[in-house]
Regions:
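Active-site capping/gating segments
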Residues: 124-142
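C-terminal hydrophobic helical "lid"/dimerization subdomain
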Residues: 31-43, 54-65, 70, 83-90, ...
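Short, acidic/turn-prone active-site loops that include or flank metal/cofactor-
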Residues: 25, 102-106, 130
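Glycine-centered, small-residue-biased loops immediately flanking beta-strands
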Residues: 17, 96-97
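Rossmann-fold NAD(P)-binding glycine/threonine-rich loop
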Residues: 82-86, 90, 102-122, 136-138
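Conserved helix-to-beta-strand junction in the class I
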Residues: 12, 90-94, 101
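N-terminal Rossmann-like NAD(P) cofactor-binding module of classical short-chain dehydrogenase/reductase
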Residues: 73-76
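Mid-domain Rossmann-like dinucleotide-binding core that forms the NAD(H)/NADP(H) cofactor-binding site
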Residues: 1-54
Length: 231
């Protein structure tokens, strides 16, 4: 969802001047930079900054320095972690809003928040799990026009026969979104595993090549190839 949010943030009408993306893993940062580069963001008029907060001595101080001390108008939290929530609360600008997008499963999940800032700096905290029907329509329309890249979120592809086991074991299945084609039978398969499977299966070898020429992303060409193979 984080990659999808970055892609969306570059395209809406009242777009931000700057987007700062935080991670604690250089490999994931490099992957994000590969599929949504700083240069691509600049072409949309947005300054995009990727930072590894694990390498920071003082995370709050250094993140605020990226805004010249002003703070962030909007903070999105994509993990239900107390420390991350408290850090997000600490870097909001005046009249800022923090959105806890990651849904916690612990009914007692809580963290410390600055109620002084809530009163005097008009800071706000909200939680959301998705959008309205109109939001979905907008996303589909933008995807159809090529304005956003929903493919950056897809890491696995499978058929209808893979749904039950994938759903039951979702916490143990790494990666992002799992794309299901309901009219074919195919195990839920990671796009990154196509190359290994291609060592013994010519179809996956070709499918891997199609994805790799698209920065490792699923595409219309890959989809057409899959559907033709399983028809």
């Amino acid at each position: 969802m984080g990659l999808g949010a970055i892609s969306y943030g570059l395209t809406f009408e009242n777009k931000p001047k700057r987007i700062v993306v935080t991670e604690i893993n250089d490999e994931r940062i490099n992957r994000a930079r590969e599929v949504i580069s700083e240069e691509e963001a600049a072409a949309h008029g947005v300054e995009l900054i990727y930072v590894n907060t694990a390498a920071m001595q003082d995370q709050v101080k250094e993140l605020l320095e990226l805004t010249d001390g002003k703070g962030y108008d909007d903070v999105f939290v994509y993990i239900p972690n107390r420390g991350v929530c408290e850090m997000g609360n600490s870097i909001m600008a005046y009249d800022g809003c923090m959105n806890l997008f990651a849904g916690p499963t612990d009914m007692k999940f809580s963290s410390m928040i600055n109620l002084y800032d809530c009163h005097y700096s008009r800071s706000k905290i909200i939680g959301s799990t998705g959008g309205t029907i109109d939001d979905m329509k907008e996303a589909i329309e933008k995807e159809a026009k090529g304005l956003i890249k929903s493919a950056v979120m897809i890491t696995h592809v499978g058929g209808l026969d893979s749904v039950v086991e994938t759903t039951k074991n979702l916490p143990e299945v790494p990666g992002g979104k799992k794309l299901v084609y309901t009219h074919i039978n195919m195990p839920m398969t990671a796009i990154d595993d196509f190359g290994k499977l291609g060592e013994s299966d010519p179809f996956f070898k070709e499918l891997d090549a199609v994805c790799k020429k698209n920065k490792g992303l699923w595409s219309a060409e890959a989809e057409n190839m899959l559907l033709e193979h399983f028809q």
